[in-house]
Design a protein with these regions (language model features):
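Conserved short acidic donor-positioning loop in nucleotide-sugar-dependent glycosyltransferases
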Residues: 1, 26-28, 54, 63
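Conserved donor nucleotide-binding strand/loop of the catalytic core
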Residues: 37-71
Length: 167
């Protein structure tokens, strides 16, 4: 369920020049609809709705499928969580890197070295990045980032990955 941070994300993206913002309402209840109503008032925003919560994985797939069907000429998509943890300028940088490198998925990464980072978050990220490196042979500093720039040619594949909840 979103809060006022969703509008901070939307307004930041619009100020940064993004003109096609897709938001998935993943089964939010009536008490949490105001942020979606406010976002929908912007011409740059399209709201896609799940009547019941289906999970982050399904929400992402819904957006990918929408883009495949309705935005065939895009370079790709940038996924951003609705909690305003990513700066619009960093979102733009990821988008530009993806456009410059259309064979690669670009991941934003958070700084886990600060004193304000909960030990649980730091530990969880260290475990998952170690598992990812062991399983895939690739070093990624933030495996749980919500900031991803994905070239359009990978959207069909991404929409068919097994799992719906963001396993």
């Amino acid at each position: 369920n979103p809060d006022e941070k969703l509008m901070l994300v939307v307004e930041g993206l619009i100020k940064e020049g993004f003109e096609d913002i897709i938001i998935v309402n993943d089964g939010s209840d009536e008490a949490h609809m105001q942020p979606f109503k406010e976002a929908a008032a912007h011409k740059e925003v399209t709201i896609l709705t799940h009547e019941v919560n289906k999970g982050k994985g399904r929400a992402l797939k819904t957006a990918y499928e929408y883009c495949i069907a309705n935005r065939p000429d895009i370079d790709g998509v940038v996924t951003v969580d609705g909690d305003n943890q990513h700066r619009p300028a960093d979102i733009r940088k990821c988008c530009e890197k993806m456009i410059d490198n259309p064979d690669y998925v670009v991941l934003g990464c958070r700084d886990f070295s600060g004193e304000n980072v909960p030990a649980k978050s730091r530990f969880g990220n260290n475990v998952t990045k170690g598992v990812f490196r062991f399983a895939c042979g690739i070093k990624i500093s933030d495996t749980q980032t919500g900031l991803r720039a994905i070239p359009a040619k990978y959207l069909d594949f991404m929409s068919r990955i097994k799992g719906e909840r963001f396993e």
